[in-house]
Design a protein with these regions (language model features):
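Short helix-capping and inter-helix turn/linker motifs at the boundaries of alpha-helical repeat units
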Residues: 119-120
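Short linear motifs at protein or domain termini
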Residues: 1-39, 43, 158-167
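C-terminal effector-binding regulatory domain of bacterial HTH transcription factors
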Residues: 139-167
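Conserved amphipathic alpha-helical segments that form helical-bundle/coiled-coil interaction surfaces
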Residues: 17, 22, 26, 45-110, ...
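Short alpha-helical functional segments enriched in proximate histidine and acidic residues
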Residues: 36, 84, 88, 155
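Residue-level signal for the nucleotide or nucleotide-sugar donor/cofactor binding architecture
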Residues: 136
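Helix-loop junctions at the membrane-solvent interface of multi-pass transporters
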Residues: 37, 89, 112-113, 160
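Nucleotide phosphate-binding site architecture
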Residues: 12, 35, 95, 114, ...
Length: 167
């Protein structure tokens, strides 16, 4: 939301270019702090429980959703997973930057455009990523986090480009 004194407020429409830039930053953060993130998740049973519960809730929410609005609520669980992941960096500035990026802001634009299968693929990628973290397979974690963000980038930027053409 953009607020300008004496002019009002409006919702800033995210462009495919802006989303692409955000994914560049996400990839940078998620991979630069990867060793620390993996180590901290592996030694924190509370965080492990939170992540596993999040993944299970996410998959369940996708499976039982009967409307687009219920599918849209799954994005909150997606965002929560990534917040838990980046919080394991234990770097306050990185966590602040992640929140400021508002990288899940695109959700409002893509509701109804992404299929249940695409949404489920993302949740299942979270599970694979988490399994690799628990196994301490850092090269695999790097590959999976990169793949996950690139898949999301492709899906979201494709949808945003289509929406840009129709407006």
């Amino acid at each position: 939301i953009i607020s300008v004194p004496r002019k009002g407020m409006w919702v800033h429409r995210i462009s495919s270019e802006e989303a692409n830039d955000i994914f560049d930053l996400r990839l940078m953060m998620d991979t630069f702090y990867l060793d620390r993130i993996v180590d901290n998740i592996r030694k924190n049973p509370t965080l492990q429980t939170q992540i596993q519960a999040n993944i299970q809730s996410h998959i369940r929410a996708i499976n039982i959703a009967t409307s687009q609005s219920e599918l849209a609520s799954a994005y909150q669980l997606d965002e929560k997973f990534h917040g838990l992941y980046i919080s394991a960096s234990q770097n306050k500035k990185v966590m602040e930057m992640y929140r400021t990026l508002n990288s899940h802001a695109y959700a409002a634009y893509i509701v109804g455009h992404e299929t249940r299968a695409q949404i489920m693929d993302g949740a299942l990628e979270h599970q694979k990523l988490y399994d690799a973290i628990l196994s301490n397979e850092k090269m695999e974690v790097h590959r999976l986090v990169t793949l996950h963000l690139e898949n999301a980038r492709h899906n979201i930027c494709t949808i945003l480009k289509e929406l840009e053409l129709t407006t």
